[in-house]
Amino acid sequence: MAKTNLNDFDKIIVLDFGSQYNQLITRRIRDFGIYSELLPHDLSIEKIKEMAPKGIIFSGGPNSVYDKGALKVDPEIFKLGIPILGICYGMQLMSYDLGGKVEKADNSEYGRADIEVIDPNAVLFEGLPREQYVWMSHGDLVTKAPEGFTITAKSKNCPISAIANDEKKFYGIQFHAEVRNSEYGLDILKNFAFKVCGAKANWTMDDFIEMQVDEIRKKVGDKKVILGLSGGVDSSVTATLLHKAIGDQLTAIFVDHGMLRKDEGDQVMQALNKDLGVNIIRVNAQERFLNKLKGVTDPEQKRKIIGKEFIEVFNEEAKKLKDVDFLAQGTLYTDVIESGTNTAQTIKSHHNVGGLPEDMHFELIEPLRKLFKDEVRELGEKLGIPHDLVWRQPFPGPGLGIRVIGEVTEDKLKIVRESDAILREEIKNAGLQEDIWQYFTVLPGIRSVGVMGDGRTYDYTIGIRAVTSIDGMTADFAQIPWDVLSKISTRIVDECDHINRVVYDITSKPPSTIEWE
């Protein structure tokens, strides 16, 4: 049976106590095929009852339960008959609220720790080795479990590493099962989701598409929608989903600022407009953007100018359209979480990169606001967007404008665009495109002496940046084979004008960022 709203899916909710890993918990549960949301720690009991989750997870957080202003839950939550898993601070809070004892640890644990499962019947550890390593990050610990709880695991510095009350289906783990540094963390979460909560894996992208198409049609009716199309994955998927729902009632305004990767604008038009039928107005505005950027070298100023100009071009085109009621955006669930709100809004001034004039009144529509980035990519493929377009690497809004260090000119953009295309082609030829998180070229504005033929040259240097990462928060430089780097370097020098040197950035993040500007 088709799902028509989120209440039709089994769900496990995560209450937010401030941990840096909160989004990961939600992601892991969704990866199991179970719908999950990250919600405020003080979510009302009435709202929880309305959502009817199969389980609740208390996240970790930086507080001590004894801190003034420490984040708490309504004690009534323990009377709902819903299974609860407390992670790190979540375990401490549950223990404290139910009569256990929490104290400051003599030896705080930050990093890898070895635990031993001491209860052979512990459901969270069912089917897992007795000894395993986990990721700890805590300054307090539970020193006495609440009445009715058994201790199920211990470590050298944390004698109560996991607790269980099977009768009430309350469980606690002092470590972070959601991070990959915990050896069997995902299995522990699976045991909670399926064996304890009895949740069904019925969260599918096909159902989401049907649900969203139905919601969009009900909301929009016979009215018109506009969308600012950047050429990126999020706005492209938003456009395609809206087109599936309302067809030509959608007009996407594609502001081509002339700082996209090689052939990228044409690829977007081919895939979305010609192949999928999305109604797109393409505005070729490179000259306009370059005029505004003339003489500007500060990276933050460049970003602001590009963002402001994007909005102005979008506004001019939007005003040409008549009787438009809705503005669509490619807002993702990560944006919703970071903004601290989960409520829809009607706007007068709103856009991804700036604000619309006060005299433009639109109602906001955000069909991707419940999805993470990887889910958006899956959705894009389901909607028929080409794989290469859906799986393009992260690309900054200002585009190549911040990969030209210093003043941006048409000639410099051409150098970066051509060198970047060579890098991509050779990485793909070597079969490395799925192994490297992100890779691109940079024009640092450095000139150096070289020799080409019988003559002396004094030309630009190209920098290659390639990194491996899991989430982009930290990154290591990619160890590309020397023969591949050699071929890339040779081709860039031979095929790109005004380049006589290629260097490879071997700095990790931190201390460097992935982008140079």
UniProtKB/Swiss-Prot annotation:
Keyword check for Ligase: yes
GO cellular component: cytosol
Reaction(s) catalysed (UniProt annotation): XMP + L-glutamine + ATP + H2O = GMP + L-glutamate + AMP + diphosphate + 2 H(+)
Sequence ranges assigned to domain Glutamine amidotransferase type-1 in this UniProt record: 11-202
Active-site residues annotated for this sequence: C88, H176, E178
Cystine connections: none
PANTHER family according to UniProt: GMP SYNTHASE [GLUTAMINE-HYDROLYZING], GMP SYNTHASE-RELATED
HAMAP family documented for this protein: GMP_synthase (MF_00344)
Protein name as catalogued: GMP synthase [glutamine-hydrolyzing]
Gene responsible for this protein: guaA
